Amino acid sequence: MKTGALTTFLALCLPVTVFATTLRLSNEVDLLVLDGKKVSSSLLRGAESIELENGPHQLVFRVEKTIRLPGNEERLYISPPLVISFDTQLINQVNFQLPRLENEREASHFNAAPRLALLDGDAMPIPVKLDILAITSTAKVVDYEIETERYNKSAKRASLPQFATMMADDSTLLSDVSELDTVPPQSQTLTEQRLKYWFRLADPQTRHHFLQWAEKQPPS
């Protein structure tokens, strides 16, 4: 897809639905999956927030933070993947509140019994269900989307069954053939649909930065 066409395509993807909840992102949180869908890290890189519809949501993420070691050394701490589910029906903003994580002892405690809070726009706690996402795959590269689907089918603490089958068949994401001048390979069409989905969720500033980047890309 040529850059100009890509820009027009994304501009037309702006949602007609008015989103009512802003999820404020944290530079210490690596978002992996949102509501059963793998997060497009390239599109959300540098984004400050994501716009969500009111209702139930589920995040899969890792906490990443530099911690101190003895001898004034430092290392990057990366937590196990965590699952958190919550409802934004009457909430207009969601903010992460992480516990103190400054050293190996605190990191070990967090690994064993993770705890964190989500706060609304008035800094009031949002009811959440938090769990560790146990990885069943032995592959070097983990498909967190598939692992999340398994988790949601297992009736665990933070499971949301409505997100268990959303990604079971990628064909459900494909647009009607009438929207396309020609029928591209399924993988290409799916890539466009995923890009469209994450573009819709990105905040206006991130959309603007992405469109600026897209304009500078050479035509394929």
UniProtKB/Swiss-Prot annotation:
- Note the SS bond partners: none
Q: What is the lineage of its organism?
A: Bacteria, Pseudomonadati, Pseudomonadota, Gammaproteobacteria, Enterobacterales
Q: Which gene encodes it?
A: yccT
On whether Ribonucleoprotein is a keyword of this UniProt record, the answer is no
Q: Which UniProt keywords apply?
A: Signal
Keyword check for Signal: yes
Q: Which Pfam families match?
A: DUF2057
Sequence similarity: Belongs to the UPF0319 family.
> Secretion signal: which residues?
1-20
What species does this protein belong to? Answer: Salmonella schwarzengrund (strain CVM19633)
Q: Mind telling me what this protein is named? A: UPF0319 protein YccT
